[in-house]
Amino acid sequence: GGQGGPVAAPAPPDARHAPVLLRECLGAFAGRELGVFADCTLGLGGHSGAVLAEHPEVRTFVGVDKDPRALEIARGRLSAGGAAGLRAPPAAMNFVRGDFRELPEHLRGAGLPGEGAADGILMDLGFSSLQVDDPERGFSFLRDGPLDMRMDPAQALSARVAVNEWGEEELGRVLRDLGEERHWRRLAGRIVQFRAARGSIETTGELVEALGAKGWKPYHARRGRGPGGGRRAGPALHPATRTFQALRIAVNGELQSVESALPAAIDALAPGGRLGVISFHSLEDRLVKWAFRRAAGQARAAPLSKQEKFSGVRASVTGPELGGTDAARVRILTKRPLTAAPEEVEENPRSRSAKLRVVEKL
């Protein structure tokens, strides 16, 4: 876990740091006996703090994150007297710097069996507001900073490498398939022209400029008139949104991570244990839905979408997973994903695209 000196008490969580779908997550574990609880994507500990407050019976907690700073903040928040308000935190608190794909290994590190040990597991596939709000990490098109986007700062591939070294065709495919960007061809061309003219693209601000999105305002900020002069709200989506999403997914191999993390998390569940997964875009939600269906014995593998064919997801899967139906290992508790109530969306716009799916181990 993250080592280091004492941490300043974290500021009270504002809307940006508010855990999404918190009520729905608590509902997923309500009335369950959680002896062992694991949060695969700990972030600042918002979800876990609330779960632990409602479940004083938790004996062993395992919180996993790649980001050492997030771990340090979460450790402070979840300690006795910390911001989460836990009077008596679980006896065994484990903070692990690691990858959520390796949950069984992290459980073994906490002295538990790697499989069949966890009564509750939570996975939030969104990226932490700590990363988005730090311009140095290069995740946000709203704050100028180095073009980076690596969840794991130690890896070689960054957004800067992708934007400057990938060919126009490859960039276009990434924007189309991972960003679901309609104007992929035009935007890939702009990136390549801009870097040829400037020598390279080094910052998030330069990338926004390359995309022709510098100084963009939604229509409602332009005296409330839409493109035809009519009074209607304009598109709320910044034109760089999908490009930044695509690069983030590509740089971090996010779809492949989710693809291998879900079966590992299901393995880690004890009988009757529950796994809740929050996703933020349709590609991820689709992967979660089909992984759960396969584990519930309801479906053969999903037909490969363009995105999955392109990203190499499931390309390596052979044998029973693509052949027949797996024997049922879980029961799906969410026929449709749970989404944020209008009040939450108003308070925290990030929650608008969040979806929660839950399964229970048989």
Question: Model-predicted segments: where are they?
Answer:
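S-adenosyl-L-methionine-dependent methyltransferase catalytic core, i.e., the SAM/SAH-binding region
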Residues: 1-362
